[in-house]
């Protein structure tokens, strides 16, 4: 029997994002090291590396509170990342179109001469390559433009759930601060500094 093929890096990233999109919750690393192997087949050893790659690419948010890192990726972030990617692709397509027009003019000038020059041959090859690149960019732009109204509505609903989840965390943090003040007599600003809580920390409207 052949050995079962492991997941590729991209498959791991996709499955990790599924955890966030399906649960719409906030996790610590230790939580994901338990959930990912069981539900998505991602080995516990690779969870941290996969998470970091998603954080580096702006797909997942990470915030340190006290001594722990918390990870989340609400649907609105994915939408913003998609919008940014589309803007980059459209910019590349525009630049490619301008270069295409410039090369076409150069080739027309080269055709005026009677002989097939090396310059004309080089320009023709470059133009052909540019056409291929432009077609690829067009296809990718169309892919990112395709946005189902149902998906938009799902994102709106997910944002609502995400806001409620964030406010539940805010409730918990305020409760812990209140308990610490009563139990140990700590001043509120000392608690904020100790646990890295910003001064403007509050509920999301």
UniProtKB/Swiss-Prot annotation:
Localization of this protein = Nucleus
Matching entries from InterPro entries are given as: LZ3wCH, Mnd1, Mnd1_HTH, WH_DNA-bd_sf
Q: What is its main location?
A: nucleus
Any one GO MF term held by the record is: double-stranded DNA binding
What family classification does the UniProt entry report for this protein? Belongs to the MND1 family.
Whether Transmembrane counts among this entry's keywords is no
Identification of the protein by name: Meiotic nuclear division protein 1 homolog
The root-end lineage is: Eukaryota, Metazoa, Chordata, Craniata, Vertebrata
User: Which cellular components does GO assign to this protein?
Assistant: nucleus
Residue runs in coiled coils: 84-173
List keywords of the entry alphabetically.
Answer: Acetylation, Coiled coil, DNA recombination, DNA-binding, Meiosis, Nucleus
Q: Which PANTHER family match?
A: MEIOTIC NUCLEAR DIVISION PROTEIN 1 HOMOLOG
**N-acetylserine-modified residues are where?**
2
Source domain of life is Eukaryota
How does this polypeptide assemble, per the annotation?
Heterodimer with PSMC3IP/HOP2. MND1-PSMC3IP interacts with DMC1 and RAD51 and binds preferentially to dsDNA.
Which Pfam family, just one, is annotated for this protein?
Answer: LZ3wCH
Protein role: Required for proper homologous chromosome pairing and efficient cross-over and intragenic recombination during meiosis. Stimulates both DMC1- and RAD51-mediated homologous strand assimilation, which is required for the resolution of meiotic double-strand breaks.
Any single GO BP term: reciprocal meiotic recombination
């Amino acid at each position: 029997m052949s050995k079962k093929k492991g997941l590729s890096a991209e498959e791991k990233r996709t499955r990790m994002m599924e955890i966030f999109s399906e649960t719409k919750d906030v996790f610590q690393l230790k939580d994901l090291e338990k959930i990912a192997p069981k539900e998505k087949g991602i080995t516990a050893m690779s969870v941290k590396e996969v998470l970091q790659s998603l954080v580096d690419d702006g797909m997942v948010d990470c915030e340190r509170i006290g001594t722990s890192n918390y990870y989340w990726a609400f649907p609105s972030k994915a939408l913003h990342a998609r919008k940014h990617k589309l803007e980059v692709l459209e910019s590349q397509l525009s630049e490619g179109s301008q270069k295409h027009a410039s090369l076409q003019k150069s080739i027309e000038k080269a055709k005026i001469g009677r002989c097939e020059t090396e310059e004309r041959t080089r320009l023709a090859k470059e133009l052909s390559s540019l056409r291929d690149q432009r077609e690829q960019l067009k296809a990718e732009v169309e892919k990112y433009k395709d946005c189902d109204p149902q998906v938009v509505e799902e994102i709106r609903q997910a944002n609502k759930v995400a806001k409620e989840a964030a406010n539940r965390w805010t409730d918990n943090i305020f409760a812990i601060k209140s308990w610490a003040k009563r139990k140990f007599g700590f001043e509120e600003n000392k608690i904020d500094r100790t646990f890295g809580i910003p001064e403007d920390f509050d509920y999301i409207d």
